[in-house]
């Protein structure tokens, strides 16, 4: 049984993407730059190849962080921060150019949107790991992933109901990424220790401000940065997402309860991982941040992918039970950690083994969804994806029309 039904197939044929980027920086600075960049790509290069190439930059960035700081609590060489910044800039550029290439080659389709947003969902995890390397924040890296994942999920949820993806005047894909790669480049000059030491040492001006309730507590600068990101970006964005969805639901005389139910799988994911980490006898968040973030990142990607597919196929609003498939595995490590609590800290199964299995499960589930949906949309729309021969040339990835005839 496939992921797309007969109604979904007909909807895909009529689907048209609607989006708006209200960022002033994007409009007057980056858009002209991206418009020039797209001319550097040959017309035969499919948009999805550009998307995939941009995503691999972040995978490489996370890999560098793992090689030089496996627990993300030691300072990597300075050039690694420079590489993090450059690779993130390239990712942002390629992510913006792929859509322009699709319009340039008249190859836009729902599959391109799904492929692009699917890579972006996974990118949250890989860039969080790169940022964790730069901030030297260890287990706190998971919280930085959360700062990216929450607005991303809520924006996808809002898009599901409003049918238009609106990026506000200041948004994550533009100004947010710019701040992050500037932080990487800044760390190339200062060193990662600047973020990991007490914020009053990094910013001496705060040493003059009387804070009696914090005078005996050492607070790393990255914790202050995390709080500022939550208060200044995440909370306002979430409030806007909920408000926009509520406005649309009320205008259609729908149920806000059904709308909010679609957030439950994401809440269940965060709750399950949080319970596992709090009970963990081996402190997995501190000792294995890469495996934890990657496993949860692919879990998150699966949830986002199912919601995007539901939007593309105009499925009924409400909870999607299939989304809980990605959460089933979390029952085992939680039970294993509970057993350790009553067994003098000795789990039945080594947590490193469970973490590896968790990653394998979520990666496998995500790839199954991705490959299946690619083939189903390809057949539904009569397009090729990832590889095709056009006029004697082999196209390695992307979306190209099927030639007429047999």
Residue ranges and their predicted role:
Residues 1-44, 148-406:
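C-terminal membrane-associated helical module and adjoining short loops/tails
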Residues 10-77, 81, 91-93:
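N-terminal signal-anchor/initial transmembrane insertion module
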Residues 23, 87-88, 116:
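Alpha-helical transmembrane segments of multi-pass integral membrane proteins
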Residues 39, 102, 106-119, 167-170:
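Juxtamembrane helix-capping/reentrant segments at transmembrane boundaries
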Residues 47-50, 109-113, 141, 176:
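Alpha-helical transmembrane segments and their helix-entry boundary regions
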Residues 54-111, 127-128, 139-151, 222:
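Membrane-embedded alpha-helical segments that form the functional core of polytopic membrane enzymes
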Residues 59-64, 122-134, 181-188:
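Membrane-interfacial alpha-helical segments at the cytosolic side of multi-pass membrane proteins
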Residues 98, 112-128, 172-179:
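Alpha-helical transmembrane segments that form the membrane-embedded catalytic/substrate-binding core
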């Amino acid at each position: 049984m496939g992921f797309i039904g007969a109604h979904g197939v007909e909807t895909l044929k009529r689907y048209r993407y609607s989006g708006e980027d209200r960022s002033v920086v994007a409009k007057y600075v980056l858009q002209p730059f991206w418009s020039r960049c797209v001319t550097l790509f040959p017309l035969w290069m499919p948009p999805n190849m550009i998307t995939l190439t941009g995503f691999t930059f972040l995978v490489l960035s996370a890999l560098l962080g793992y090689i030089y700081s496996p627990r993300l609590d030691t300072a990597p060489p300075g050039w690694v921060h420079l590489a993090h910044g450059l690779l993130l800039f390239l990712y942002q550029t390629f992510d913006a150019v792929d859509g322009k290439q699709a319009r340039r080659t008249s190859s836009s389709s729902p599959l391109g949107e799904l492929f692009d947003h699917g890579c972006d969902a996974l990118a949250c995890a890989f860039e969080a790991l790169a940022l964790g390397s730069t901030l030297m924040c260890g287990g706190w890296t998971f919280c930085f992933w959360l700062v990216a994942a929450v607005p991303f999920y809520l924006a996808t949820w809002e898009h599901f109901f409003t049918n238009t993806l609106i990026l506000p005047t200041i948004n994550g894909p533009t100004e947010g990424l710019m701040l992050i790669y500037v932080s990487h480049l800044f760390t190339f000059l200062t060193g990662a220790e600047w973020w990991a030491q007490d914020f009053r040492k990094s910013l001496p001006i705060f040493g003059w401000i009387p804070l009696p309730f914090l005078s005996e507590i050492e607070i790393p600068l990255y914790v202050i940065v995390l709080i500022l990101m939550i208060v200044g970006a995440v909370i306002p964005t979430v409030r806007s997402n909920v408000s926009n969805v509520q406005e649309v639901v009320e205008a259609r005389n729908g149920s806000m309860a059904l709308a909010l139910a679609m957030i439950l799988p994401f809440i269940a994911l965060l709750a399950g991982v949080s319970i596992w980490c709090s009970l963990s006898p081996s402190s997995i968040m501190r000792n294995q941040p890469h495996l934890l973030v990657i496993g949860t990142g692919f879990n998150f990607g699966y949830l986002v992918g199912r919601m995007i597919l539901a939007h593309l196929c105009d499925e009924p609003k409400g909870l999607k039970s299939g989304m809980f498939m990605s959460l089933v595995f979390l029952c085992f490590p939680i039970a294993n950690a509970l057993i350790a609590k009553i067994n003098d800290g000795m789990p039945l199964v080594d947590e490193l083994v469970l973490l590896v299995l968790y990653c394998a499960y979520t990666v496998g589930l995500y790839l199954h969804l991705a490959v299946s949906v690619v083939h189903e949309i390809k057949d539904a729309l009569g397009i090729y994806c990832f590889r095709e021969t056009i006029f004697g040339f082999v196209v390695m990835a992307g979306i190209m029309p099927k030639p007429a005839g047999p």
